[in-house]
């Protein structure tokens, strides 16, 4: 732990006032609260080395959280700052103004950002993501995915279960879906869904101002034992594209 800016008196004082305790396997770090209207309590930079799989719970008014390596369950919140993780267990991540990025989350993922980008390479579990202003990118998710976005584009690479997405302004694209239900809604934006080869699709799609492009072709119904995905897509102004997924 050290002052964020060497020689800054407020930062030096903040470092001196920071309390560190360790008891029964629990490490606690508390920095001083902002004092007065200006809230000029100084800033510190803290580096903690933990065993793999450690559980982490942290909050900050202003500050970033960065983690390398594998962690256990994580609960992190910051009013103003980014959250950058490598691999974690179940995660609850929140920032009012900042980006959230993670390589892999094992378990339930709950991610909220007021204004920023969200990018997760892989979620092995279900996920609930809310983004008021910014793009959201999920490469792969194995469980049910729920997305709520006000302004921003949504990209999902591979979805292995249900997907429900609702946005006000922005495009939504799911590159590959194999089974389950897909429910996409946007007020303004294009919707694009790639159906895995060999999967039958039951479509319920509508756009008020735009065009529906269905590249799957007509079918009498799915073959016996075939995977089926039910698609419901609605856009007020934009196109809807239903196509076969590209091989991964």
Task: Describe the residue ranges of each PLM region.
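Intrinsically disordered, low-complexity terminal regions
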Residues: 1-248
């Amino acid at each position: 732990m050290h002052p964020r800016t060497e020689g800054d008196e407020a930062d030096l004082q903040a470092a001196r006032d920071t309390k560190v305790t360790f008891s029964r396997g629990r490490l606690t770090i508390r920095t001083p609260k902002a004092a007065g209207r200006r809230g000029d309590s100084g800033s510190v930079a803290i580096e903690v080395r933990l065993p793999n799989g450690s559980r982490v719970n942290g909050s900050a008014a202003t500050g970033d959280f960065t983690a390398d390596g594998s962690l256990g369950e994580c609960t992190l919140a910051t009013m103003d700052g980014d959250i950058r993780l490598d691999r974690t267990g179940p995660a609850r991540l929140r920032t009012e103004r900042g980006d959230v990025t993670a390589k892999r989350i094992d378990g339930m993922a709950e991610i909220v950002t007021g204004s920023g980008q969200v990018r997760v390479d892989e979620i092995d579990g279900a996920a609930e993501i809310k983004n008021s202003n910014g793009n959201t990118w999920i490469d792969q998710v194995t469980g049910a995915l729920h997305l709520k976005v006000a302004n921003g584009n949504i990209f999902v690479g591979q979805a292995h279960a249900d997907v429900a997405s609702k946005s006000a302004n922005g495009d939504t694209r799911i590159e590959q879906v194999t089974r389950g239900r897909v429910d996409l809604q946007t007020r303004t934006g294009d919707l694009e869904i790639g159906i895995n080869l060999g999967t039958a699709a039951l479509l319920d799609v509508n756009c008020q101002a735009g065009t529906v492009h269905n590249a799957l072709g007509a079918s009498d119904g799915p073959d016996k034992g075939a995977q089926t995905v039910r698609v419901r897509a609605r856009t007020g102004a934009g196109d809807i594209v239903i196509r076969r997924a590209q091989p991964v």
